[in-house]
Amino acid sequence: WRWMADLAKEESAKELESIIQNAPVKVRTYSTLGLRDDADFLLWFMSESIEDIQETISKIYHTVAGKYFIPSRVYLSSTRPSIYARKNRLHSFVTGMDPKKYVVVYPFIKTREWYLLPFEQRKIMMDEHSKTGEKFPQVELNTTYSFGIHDEDFMLAFESDDLHAFQDLIMDLRQNKVSAYVAVDTPMIVC
């Protein structure tokens, strides 16, 4: 891709943009250029239909630019109401809210011990966890569920215009009791 002539890049970018704009799915694009050694960008697909996502990706792969794409990571998850939340809210990408400047995406796996705890004990810890998040209104959390359809329990996507606020949030969350039950929360993909 980097070796293509500028005009060819421009034309292939238009081709790709047309597919994304006309896709039967929502697509958000983010740059990871210089932030990761395994990818230059992230594509976030949202749809009621896995088949629509697959069809869109297939069309992308058939473009001039798409022939150069090699996925470094693929994650699958779905939206559903939280069993711990006092009130459930719609995710920013579902409501059509404009994306923030940054998104930090990562897979999340809790320990087996977490799921063996009584529900009320887990709920108390999750309430503390939620209250910590409420101190950072400038950071929007999108939690989606991967149980049974991918390798992790959840996919988290934090959106913010301020990476320092996100970092402060994560540092505070590490001090919550629930953090003792985190098995995996990497890789962190900053876009």
Label the predicted regions.
Residues 1-22, 48-56, 70-135, 147-149, ...:
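Short S/T/G/P-rich N-terminal loop/turn motif that feeds into the first structured element of a domain
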Residues 31-32, 42-48, 57, 143-146, ...:
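A structural feature that tracks compact, well-ordered secondary-structure segments
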Residues 1-2, 155-191:
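C-terminal functional regions that serve as terminal interaction/effector modules
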Residues 24-40, 61-99, 139-152, 177-191:
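Glycine-rich beta-strand-turn "strand-cap" elements at beta-sheet edges
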Residues 58-65, 131-134, 171-178:
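Short, intrinsically disordered, mixed-charge
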